[in-house]
Every structure is written in C-alpha cells, then in structure tokens.
C-alpha cells in the first residue's frame, strides 16, 4: 500500500526560480495525477495545479517550498515533482 499523504521539502535551485516556464512544467506534471497537490512557502499555500498560484509564491533561487500531496497516487506525484525541481526544471 502506498502513502495517501506525502510531504516533501524542496529547494528551488534553477537560476531564475519559478517563472512562467517552470510553473507551466510543474502544473503539467501535477495534472497527470489524481491526488490533490499544494505548495507552501512562507505560510502561503497554493494549488500545485495552478500556474498563477505557483507564480504568486515568488519563489526565487534558494527558496524553500513544502510540497503536500494527498490521494491514491500521492507518493508517485510527490516523487515526480521532486525530481522536476531537483533537475532545475530541465533549464540548465
């Protein structure tokens, strides 16, 4: 049985942070999963399936984010989104 709720701490390491292209890639990946996905920064929580929500976090390089996934495919979603962030959104 896989976890229904997963929380991961992420650090933004790409040069420009989460701007339009990384936000779109994150949302495209997130929308492949049925689970709920939320991203938190500095006490503000946004829907991880919303480009505008992610961009409102103003997450620049070095920003610390908390990823919350909840649902039947939560573990897989969290893993794929963590890989995306770790690989700098494939920008570099």
Segments predicted by a language model, with ranges:
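Intrinsic-disorder/low-complexity, polar/charged segments enriched in Ser/Thr/Lys/Arg/Asp/Glu/Gln
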Residues: 3-9, 64-66
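Compact, glycine-rich, soluble single-domain proteins
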Residues: 11-52, 56-60
């Amino acid at each position: 049985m896989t976890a229904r709720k997963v929380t991961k701490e992420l650090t933004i390491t790409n040069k420009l942070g989460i701007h339009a292209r990384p936000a779109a890639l994150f949302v495209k990946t997130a929308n492949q999963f049925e689970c709920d996905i939320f991203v938190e920064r500095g006490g503000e929580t946004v829907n991880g399936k919303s480009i505008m929500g992610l961009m409102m976090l103003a997450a620049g390089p070095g920003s610390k984010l908390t990823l919350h996934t909840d649902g039947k495919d939560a573990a897989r979603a969290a893993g794929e989104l963590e890989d995306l962030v770790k690989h700098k959104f494939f920008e570099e």
